Swiss-Prot record:
The RIC1-RGP1 complex acts as a guanine nucleotide exchange factor (GEF), which activates RAB6A by exchanging bound GDP for free GTP, and may thereby be required for efficient fusion of endosome-derived vesicles with the Golgi compartment. The RIC1-RGP1 complex participates in the recycling of mannose-6-phosphate receptors. Required for phosphorylation and localization of GJA1. Is a regulator of procollagen transport and secretion, and is required for correct cartilage morphogenesis and development of the craniofacial skeleton. GO terms for molecular function: guanyl-nucleotide exchange factor activity; small GTPase binding. Forms a complex with RGP1; the interaction enhances RAB6A GTPase activity. Interacts (via central domain) with RGP1. Interacts with RAB6A; the interaction is direct with a preference for RAB6A-GDP. Interacts (via C-terminus domain) with RAB33B; the interaction is direct with a preference for RAB33B-GTP. Interacts with GJA1. Belongs to the RIC1 family. This is Guanine nucleotide exchange factor subunit RIC1. It comes from Homo sapiens (Human). WD repeats lie at residues 64-103, 304-343. It comes from the Eukaryota. The lineage of its organism: Eukaryota, Metazoa, Chordata, Craniata, Vertebrata.
Amino acid sequence: MYFLSGWPKRLLCPLGSPAEAPFHVQSDPQRAFFAVLAAARLSIWYSRPSVLIVTYKEPAKSSTQFGSYKQAEWRPDSTMIAVSTANGYILFFHITSTRGDKYLYEPVYPKGSPQMKGTPHFKEEQCAPALNLEMRKILDLQAPIMSLQSVLEDLLVATSDGLLHLIHWEGMTNGRKAINLCTVPFSVDLQSSRVGSFLGFTDVHIRDMEYCATLDGFAVVFNDGKVGFITPVSSRFTAEQLHGVWPQDVVDGTCVAVNNKYRLMAFGCVSGSVQVYTIDNSTGAMLLSHKLELTAKQYPDIWNKTGAVKLMRWSPDNSVVIVTWEYGGLSLWSVFGAQLICTLGGDFAYRSDGTKKDPLKINSMSWGAEGYHLWVISGFGSQNTEIESDLRSVVKQPSILLFQFIKSVLTVNPCMSNQEQVLLQGEDRLYLNCGEASQTQNPRSSSTHSEHKPSREKSPFADGGLESQGLSTLLGHRHWHVVQISSTYLESNWPIRFSAIDKLGQNIAVVGKFGFAHYSLLTKKWKLFGNITQEQNMIVTGGLAWWNDFMVLACYNINDRQEELRVYLRTSNLDNAFAHVTKAQAETLLLSVFQDMVIVFRADCSICLYSIERKSDGPNTTAGIQVLQEVSMSRYIPHPFLVVSVTLTSVSTENGITLKMPQQARGAESIMLNLAGQLIMMQRDRSGPQIREKDSNPNNQRKLLPFCPPVVLAQSVENVWTTCRANKQKRHLLEALWLSCGGAGMKVWLPLFPRDHRKPHSFLSQRIMLPFHINIYPLAVLFEDALVLGAVNDTLLYDSLYTRNNAREQLEVLFPFCVVERTSQIYLHHILRQLLVRNLGEQALLLAQSCATLPYFPHVLELMLHEVLEEEATSREPIPDPLLPTVAKFITEFPLFLQTVVHCARKTEYALWNYLFAAVGNPKDLFEECLMAQDLDTAASYLIILQNMEVPAVSRQHATLLFNTALEQGKWDLCRHMIRFLKAIGSGESETPPSTPTAQEPSSSGGFEFFRNRSISLSQSAENVPASKFSLQKTLSMPSGPSGKRWSKDSDCAENMYIDMMLWRHARRLLEDVRLKDLGCFAAQLGFELISWLCKERTRAARVDNFVIALKRLHKDFLWPLPIIPASSISSPFKNGKYRTVGEQLLKSQSADPFLNLEMDAGISNIQRSQSWLSNIGPTHHEIDTASSHGPQMQDAFLSPLSNKGDECSIGSATDLTESSSMVDGDWTMVDENFSTLSLTQSELEHISMELASKGPHKSQVQLRYLLHIFMEAGCLDWCIVIGLILRESSIINQILVITQSSEVDGEMLQNIKTGLHAVDRWASTDCPGYKPFLNIIKPQLQKLSEITEEQVQPDAFQPITMGKTPEQTSPRAEESRGSSSHGSIPQGEVGSSNMVSRKEEDTAQAEEEEPFQDGTYDCSVS
């Protein structure tokens, strides 16, 4: 509603003695001038600019006679000021203008500037006037004056002798006697006033009073703390004609403030609270409306230590009240008690170092024009002694503080047509929450407030029409789009009175003192009247509204002295020539637009409906307005000023289903009128015969139905929101009426629809009013999105930038910098809960189902469950009819039931879990439901619940179920958590945090995170688990870390063995199902020690039973195409090996993705080593390796010049380190030289492309080579054969042949390989001839293999070359300790030369070993 902005400003008064410091400020009725009182001084200040104009100083002699000045009161026309003094005198000062055309301050413009001296009202608006103060009259009332109050043309004065004086402004009593309060009868209401009691004691007098014009009486506070309301029975103001009413329960009143618009009397009390009363229309009694008080919950340390209420002031628009206390502090409240600001907490009360500040004490305050400023005279009071010396220097030059505010448009223009956007207006700028919209429409334009612009989002204007703007637009960020109001318009029309935004959020119009101006968010331009005389000739009286591209406003024409209704087109020039003008009979107070109708409320208490339509006659487009209907409201409205808002709505007590013509349901069904906080509805009277208009004559459409007598819908209403949009899916929300009720929160008048369009019961209500509390002040409602938008003050401390003794910067130390932030809140859970409380579960279900697509709907259900649980489970008394079972049953209707319950439980303390699960069901059953629904993450959350509520055995049992399911589904993160969880259960701990990674040199990790070293094969103790990143400096196959004590003291830990058994079982199942890809992911993600396990399972699970099935499954899993025979292969020179070396190197170069050489040094020593290693491998051992995944793109690379050997980049294939086919820079010499003499024919290129096409994706190739290496190290030669067949590389077969020749290999395995290859050969002959060429190539190796098999090597004799013991006797990580001279995957003939192999190549291969299966996506990337 109202929000503080920035720091307060300080206005310095003339230097004088501390005794002359100001203590009272009072604005004139127009709030253009301020009277400031000191003990013997009266000063007049101007509001804009805020400057001192004139000061009257009382001579010392007369000052002694009169006593010090106390209070000041302005005459309604601002020509006189009455000042009361301590000795009972009233001094009347006349304010006169200095003769001539002189001003105190004038703006100086350069020559040729557009501000012309001939502008109407130029001097009056731009210059501070020169005034004189002259004391004209002195009146002695012979008793201390307690209160002054201006009443119409008289001055009402209350004195301490218990008298009320009615004095004429010329200083005469007109012969009227003073009224003695003891003669005024008081009672609890007006009906019993004649027999009322008198005050009954002699020293009674009025301490404070204020006149209420709309109640025609005085709210008074007596010196004994009682409060009351005195009203004259007739127009005569005599003791006989006065009587009073008072509430019995207020005995500690201190001050009073009256709100004329809402007819409220706010009484400040000694307790620090404010009691707000209204008058009962029927009995005249004073009824308590609400209280304004700080709560212990919000302000635990200060709520009852504020002292008495000292001052209260309602804002000029009567929408907020500001309250101060005796011990300091300031708070701001809305009309019906919503707290907006309080300076007793947060950054206002505490410094940045945590020490407490003394609250600001306020001696006097007064609102400035339109509520943009609050003038405050502060008494710093008992400040800290360390800064008292600085404050003395401040007191020497007394000052006035100006607090700056920005406010919601709803305070002054509540009938704004766009109700889904928040628009705030400040003194010279506007804040709105749709800033991102314009950027996408016109990207070239840039805002001067670029810091308030969010990132570009989809334009909400794209769909056009009246559709709801997207959430991204209205909620996208916390910043505002700030529009600076045109300075040209402000100079002569300050202050801004009204503003409005159109339905699409593209255009804003503002109204100042005269005329109006509008701004486009798309073009970033203001449009002002070209003829300034036309602007200065109109005063907008009743606000303004947008209708499509038109601005509709009610104004007063000064020249013609005529009330008018005008319509201006946005796109045309701002000129009366393009306006449509309709004359009005009386002054328009409020204006609103609904669909194609304009509704106005006039000062004669009548409502007039107009139709508005677009007219395109001739070159100029205009809008035509015609009167449709007039409704007199004078019977129901005691004073026109009491009407806060008037709107046409489509809301009625009957739903569209029950109307005889459902299509009329969204038409103008009723008038909503906010009368002093009382919401009144007048519906169309459909009881008469003219319900249906059968003929479609346009004239008949003008015959509108009359309105029924008004019905009161709600009390204490501040704002109303409704929409005429229709949406069949969300009828509940769009046909509802939303009310803001201040401290009572919000209310919604919700329609109730029968299910499945059945006929409603006649005895059931078709609408229901549901109250609910929200934590923000609502400023807009997003109807479809079930959201309330608002704003909230935030503060920033800058006191640390200044030293304590720096008195000049004291304001920045005393006050935080205030900013306004956007906020929003979901309200759907409140409504659902209210419906369930009222046994309207069916309606709640319909409403919830219509909102189930909202992104925060799960949060809505969770909030509802959580709030009901907290309330009922913590209640001290038994609840006869608990709501929790109903809510639980309601939530089960939605698929998110399981998540909602567990999320609620996880956010609730453990003590409430039993109460929750007694209502929603046993957590074990819910866990099993999650497993059946394959919702493993939710099941994991239930596991934590079970761990706390059940014995460890039950937790372990359920954890095992979940772990096995997670393994099957490849949820690796969950698997890791489950392993930790299971281990924690076994060790009796509630939770075991993950081990902290040790520091590792980053030079060789290449940015990859490898999990293998985490060793989640948990038979070892936690302290032995190395958790570092994978060290590429170690040997390829085995990770680093002190894991040699694998079967050490913890080997009997049943929990670790239990987990290991599950991991082994899963690995065995994967291998038996030939799911090698899943096995690789499993090993890489969970750090499963695959090699050591395969060594043990070599003759069991790791044995290939059916080579053909394995081959087919690998082709399918790795997306590897079956080979085909190219048509040209018969004549291809490649087949005969003519260009085998060059072609092989070319193709192999394409398979060598440079990223795999993570940081392979291309230094000379490494090149030499690599060349020496490769020199031992003759080119004849290589076959064509076409392992490229890049397809046709790579063919271009064949034909482009290859990089020279001087390049720093290594292009060798890291994937082939397990064989002897790697290449480094040295080999490109041969390729480069041979390539220049080589000319490939078309058929040869076709052959190359065919070979490329028969390879699978690059990722698959990397993964297959990783697995090949693993199986080679583990000695699973049959799997190596299968992978070699898929890759179609005879070098792999050669390696296996070398291994079988050089070591004692299991004869059964060799026999299995031989049988398997024969089966593959048969299968290739019948089903897959594409394999035949490769099988023919490796025939010699197969024959050698047959010879070896016949030798029948003993099965147990096989050991990997590097292992001295069987795997059972060594640590699974023992491979790390092997020397570089032995490598299980290097053929025997190359073992000797492998000493020279760069260790970096092994590191690269190790990186490759771990990388392919890391994140389930198998993406390879270098960081």
